[in-house]
């Protein structure tokens, strides 16, 4: 779930804040690092028996580091990715679970204002409705990633959050398993998020996101609510854009009221646009000739769950499909660039002075922004979709 994706996209960097006197820097001998974590936990006030029991079975997991560095799924474009993740079978199962858990979803919508389709989509994508929640030992994963010097400031606090869950009986360092980045349960939440937003949805006295769908869904809704989800508001809507639209106006970094988009010729493909005064952005995940959406403020909350534009667009679209929206119009988009071509484009953009982040062949927000700027400079349609034509022009 949310910080999970930071594991995919944050760059290596210094810790976000000063370490305590007991903290040990990342790297070095793993055993020495764990000793430092023990000392820090004791300094934080954790009982000695809890600290000893938590770290007793912790081991470094090289498979976690390999998984952290191999995330090719995020190189897929929206059409490819969405067709891989969304099938009629998955859609049918989502609707079946919506019916079976109708009372739970009614309660969630009343308490937190998060629509059932949103949660069902995350539940489907994260663990296939709880079927596969990951088989990495969570304590090992978190300590391994905290020891790794790419993002220690992200994962170190999660170690202590997991320890707190252990102390209250909601985590087992020897048996709790999940994703490689430390997420737990049917909607894949990190320990700190469980501490902050975990809810006992089934009333058994524990927050058990692995075995209780009610706990998992209610906790996920509470987290989205705390992140700013607006009850009763849309998140993503398929639209039809006029051929003469100024493509430089598109992109998530540019918003204007729905009424202004309507005045520019933007229409809903199904139903009506959102309220006239609602801020929105035109999202073209594969350029002006591909699918088109209007992204509302709630869509931005998705990026707190996962920072891949392809993933969140697919999840938001699937949420709409679950509740009756039609299949999107794929259009006829330019095929774009392969990984090697994307890396060449990023290198060229960087040479021109653009900050594209890591040269990794992945189309991220900074690369899209640089592409749109160069398209406008060269007199090309500035839809932020990188093409061979742009690469050749550069």
PLM feature spans:
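Sequence contexts marking disulfide-bonded cysteines in secreted/extracellular proteins
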Residues: 25-27
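Bacterial N-terminal signal peptides
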Residues: 4-17
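Mature N-terminal segment immediately following signal peptide/propeptide cleavage
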Residues: 29-48, 52
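Catalytic glycan-binding domains that act on GlcNAc-containing polysaccharides
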Residues: 46-277, 290-293, 301-319, 326-339, ...
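A general alpha-helix detector
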Residues: 33-40, 104, 141, 345-348, ...
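Short acidic, glycine/serine/threonine-rich helix-capping segments at coil-helix boundaries
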Residues: 335-342, 350-394
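Sec/Tat signal peptide C-region and signal peptidase I cleavage site
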Residues: 17-23
């Amino acid at each position: 779930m949310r910080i999970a994706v930071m594991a995919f996209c944050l760059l290596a960097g210094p810790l976000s804040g000063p370490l305590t006197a007991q903290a040990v820097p990342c790297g070095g001998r793993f055993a020495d690092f764990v000793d430092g974590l023990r000392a820090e936990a004791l300094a934080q006030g954790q009982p000695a028996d809890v600290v000893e029991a938590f770290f007793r079975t912790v081991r470094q997991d090289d498979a976690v580091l390999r998984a952290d560095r191999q995330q090719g799924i995020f190189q897929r474009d929206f059409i490819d990715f969405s067709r891989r993740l969304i099938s009629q079978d998955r859609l049918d199962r989502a609707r079946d679970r919506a019916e079976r858990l109708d009372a739970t979803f009614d309660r969630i919508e009343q308490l937190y204002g998060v629509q059932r389709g949103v949660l069902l989509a995350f539940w489907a994508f994260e663990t296939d409705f709880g079927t596969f929640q990951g088989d990495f030992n969570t304590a090992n994963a978190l300590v391994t990633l905290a020891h790794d010097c790419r993002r220690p400031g992200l994962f170190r606090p999660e170690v202590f959050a997991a320890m707190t869950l252990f102390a209250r009986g909601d985590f087992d360092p020897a048996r709790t398993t999940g994703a490689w980045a430390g997420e737990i349960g049917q909607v894949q939440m990190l320990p700190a998020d469980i501490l902050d937003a975990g809810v006992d949805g089934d009333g058994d006295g524990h927050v058990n996101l692995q075995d209780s769908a009610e706990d998992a869904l209610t906790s996920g809704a509470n987290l989205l609510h705390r992140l700013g989800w607006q009850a009763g508001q849309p998140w993503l809507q398929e639209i039809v854009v006029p051929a003469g639209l100024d493509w430089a106006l598109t992109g998530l970094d540019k918003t204007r009221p729905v009424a202004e988009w309507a005045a520019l010729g933007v229409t809903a493909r199904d139903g009506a646009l959102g309220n006239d005064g609602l801020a929105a952005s035109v999202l073209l995940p594969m350029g002006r000739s591909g699918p088109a959406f209007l992204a509302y403020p709630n869509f931005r909350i998705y990026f707190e769950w996962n920072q891949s534009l392809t993933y969140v667009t697919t999840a938001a679209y699937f949420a709409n499909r679950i509740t009756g929206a039609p299949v999107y119009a794929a259009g006829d988009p330019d095929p774009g660039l392969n990984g090697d071509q994307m890396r060449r484009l990023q290198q060229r953009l960087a040479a021109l002075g653009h900050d594209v982040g890591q040269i990794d062949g992945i189309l991220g927000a900074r690369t899209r922004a640089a592409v749109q700027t160069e398209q406008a400079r060269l007199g090309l349609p500035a839809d932020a979709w990188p093409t061979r034509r742009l690469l050749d022009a550069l």
